[in-house]
């Protein structure tokens, strides 16, 4: 008997069991990433040239004389994805810029482009600047002056700056509306590469984009610029390709681990998305020093996907109750209580976290794995509540739904797990995160409501009534569109909380907070246009995966 058939047979006792099978599409990638052979000669050649270019770039980065020059240099280096080589230099430059005129009252630079760039970059690095700096571009009614309309680059920078807004910043709300309207109107009449930049920005704002995805895009755009810096460009291309080699090695490791588990055969009801899981981690951190962290996080995402599908797309209540209890006990001796198919994922789950403890023991950090275990137990408890609602046909009030569904968004778990492989993440950082700070709550909310919008139609088609959208419609007697608009409004509020949470002073380091910000960015990209890019990666994620993990940049 084939394994899949054997599984179905074993999961039936005296009576036919009706299971909520979701019928997920197979992996897009097959064995494509299972093996990767590093060309050491090419890698060594890249490293050698990069070291030379790095010194040249450092010198050029520090050579800016005017504020506009300094900001443009920082912006280009960051967009090209090579800023991680110059973190201290950039921090020192921005600290100097901020402290010279913290209220930005000097009128040396009154142009919209420079001020908008200054505002966005400093905010993204945690410096608070008042939106009042834009008042010089507004009329008595708070509207942006129509005389700005010919300054397309200025308006484009204003548009990008508007996405770092926090609560109560009406000027930035007006900036977003003004810049969006004028960019949409101007886009068809612009020449390349500016037309491409405007169209791209309207589709995906820089602040909410996955940095590595943005890097790949910007390298191609920057190459078209007449005033491009050839040293920067070559450095960026070589660095992208060298880092891509590391990413391919890591993906190969994750893919082989996934293949060895053989869930595709033994648990055919679940999604086969190991490649998409790894892509997710590249959004959290792409830099080379986070290699171990990426592999750990990718494996965790793949594992929680299996657990999620067990609750959501296969298990029945009596099985799930035992499964939930076994995970709370976290003891391999519990395995005999489980149905055969659950034994497979239960053992794999415990083995995975044992591996984490072994890996981290080398750095004396094995104790932090407990924080990730507790988050795993938490999400499983909430999955069980959700599964009971679905199976029993219960539709909770929206407040009850959200109190449970925030955990099942996975972001409490994934944020905690993202710190495991970060050697700079201390026990104090894990303790801070365990208390669910406001920025984490915002990120979890963002993930939940955007996921609910994107998956509503599919879940409705499967007979799922306990969805956030359905609960809101029932509670408030409104249409689907009104409910979706409300959830979108909640997402915008959450983004403002995230933006506020990275502003100084902060209780933890910028490196810790950046993981949370990047997880928010992944949601914006993965669920673009209300599509579930994880479950159905062919439209949304496939082009990004090809750009980052298949195609290298021509040197």
From Swiss-Prot:
The protein's Enzyme Commission number: 4.2.3.88
Entry-linked InterPro entries: Isoprenoid_synthase_dom_sf, Terpene_cyclase-like_1_C, Terpene_cyclase_plant_C1, Terpene_synth_N, Terpene_synth_N_sf, Terpene_synthase-like, Terpene_synthase_metal-bd, Terpenoid_cyclase/PrenylTrfase
Leading EC class: lyase
Pfam families named among the record's database cross-references: Terpene_synth, Terpene_synth_C
Superkingdom, taxonomy of origin: Eukaryota
Pathway where it operates: Secondary metabolite biosynthesis; terpenoid biosynthesis
Record localization: Cytoplasm
Cofactor note: Binds 3 Mg(2+) or Mn(2+) ions per subunit.
Chain location of the short sequence motif DDXXD motif per the record: 308-312
UniProt KW Aminoacyl-tRNA synthetase keyword: no
GO BP terms in the entry: diterpenoid biosynthetic process; response to jasmonic acid; terpenoid biosynthetic process
Record bears the keyword Nucleus: no
Cellular component GO terms held in the UniProt record: cytoplasm
Annotated residues for binding of Mg(2+) 3: 451, 455, 459
Catalysed reaction equations from the record: (2E,6E)-farnesyl diphosphate = viridiflorene + diphosphate
Binding site for Mg(2+) 1: 308, 312
Reported induction: Up-regulated by jasmonic acid treatment.
Obligatory cofactor(s): Mg(2+); Mn(2+)
Keywords on record: Cytoplasm, Lyase, Magnesium, Metal-binding
Tissue-wise expression: Expressed in stem and leaf trichomes. Detected in roots, fruits and flowers.
Any one GO MF annotation of this record: terpene synthase activity
UniProt function note: Sesquiterpene synthase involved in the production of viridiflorene from (E,E)-farnesyl diphosphate (FPP). Has no activity with (Z,Z)-FPP. Can act with a low efficiency as a monoterpene synthase with geranyl diphosphate as substrate.
Stated family: Belongs to the terpene synthase family. Tpsa subfamily.
Name recorded for this polypeptide: Sesquiterpene synthase 31
């Amino acid at each position: 008997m084939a394994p899949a058939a054997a599984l179905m047979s074993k999961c039936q006792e005296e009576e036919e069991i009706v299971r909520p099978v979701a019928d997920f599409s197979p992996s897009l990638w097959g064995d494509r990433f299972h093996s990767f052979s590093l060309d050491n000669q090419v890698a060594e050649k890249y490293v050698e040239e990069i070291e030379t270019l790095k010194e040249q770039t450092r010198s050029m980065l520090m050579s800016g004389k005017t504020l506009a020059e300094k900001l443009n240099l920082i912006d280009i280096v960051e967009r090209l994805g090579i800023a991680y080589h110059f973190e201290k230099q950039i921090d020192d430059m921005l600290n100097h810029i901020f402290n010279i005129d913290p209220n930005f009252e000097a009128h040396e630079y009154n142009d919209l482009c420079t001020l908008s760039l200054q505002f966005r970059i400093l905010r993204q690095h945690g410096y608070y600047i008042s939106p009042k700096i834009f008042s010089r571009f507004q009329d008595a009614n708070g509207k942006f002056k129509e005389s700005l309309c010919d300054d397309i680059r200025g308006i484009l920078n204003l548009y990008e700056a508007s996405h770092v807004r926090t609560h109560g910043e009406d000027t930035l709300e007006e900036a977003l509306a003004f810049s969006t309207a004028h960019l949409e109107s101007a886009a068809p009449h612009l020449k390349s590469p500016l037309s491409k930049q405007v169209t791209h920005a309207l589709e995906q704002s820089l602040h909410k984009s996955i940095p590595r995805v943005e890097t790949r895009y910007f390298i191609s755009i920057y190459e078209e610029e007449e005033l491009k810096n050839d040293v920067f460009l070559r450095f960026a291309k070589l660095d992208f390709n060298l880092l891509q080699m590391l990413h391919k090695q890591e993906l190969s490791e994750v893919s082989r681990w996934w293949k060895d588990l053989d869930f595709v055969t033994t648990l055919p009801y679940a999604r086969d998305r190991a490649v998409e899981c790894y892509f997710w981690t590249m959004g959290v951190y792409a830099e080379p020093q986070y290699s171990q962290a990426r592999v750990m996080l990718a494996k965790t995402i793949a594992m929680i996907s299996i657990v999620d599908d067990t609750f959501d797309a296969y298990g029945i209540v009596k099985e799930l109750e035992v499964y939930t209890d076994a995970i709370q006990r976290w003891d391999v001796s519990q395995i005999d209580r489980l149905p055969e198919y659950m034994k497979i994922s239960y053992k794999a789950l415990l083995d995975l976290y044992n591996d984490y403890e072994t890996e981290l023991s080398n750095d004396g950090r094995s104790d932090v794995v407990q924080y990730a275990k507790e988050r795993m137990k938490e999400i499983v408890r909430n999955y069980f509540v959700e599964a009971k609602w679905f199976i029993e046909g219960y539709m909770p009030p929206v407040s009850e739904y959200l109190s449970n569904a925030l955990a099942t968004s996975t972001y409490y778990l994934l944020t905690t797990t993202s710190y495991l492989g970060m050697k700079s993440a201390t026990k104090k950082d894990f303790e801070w995160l365990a208390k669910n700070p406001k920025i984490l709550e915002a990120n979890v909310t963002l993930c939940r409501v955007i996921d609910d919008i994107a998956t509503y139609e599919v879940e409705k088609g499967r007979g799922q009534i306990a969805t956030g959208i359905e609960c809101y419609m029932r509670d408030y007697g409104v249409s689907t569109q009104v409910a979706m608009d409300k959830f979108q409004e909640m997402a915008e509020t959450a983004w403002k909380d995230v933006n506020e949470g990275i502003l100084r002073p902060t209780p933890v380091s910028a490196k810790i907070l950046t993981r949370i910000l990047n997880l928010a960015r992944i949601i914006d990209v993965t669920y673009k246009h209300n599509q579930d890019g994880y479950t159905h990666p062919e439209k949304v994620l496939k082009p990004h995966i090809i750009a980052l993990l298949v195609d290298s940049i021509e040197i």
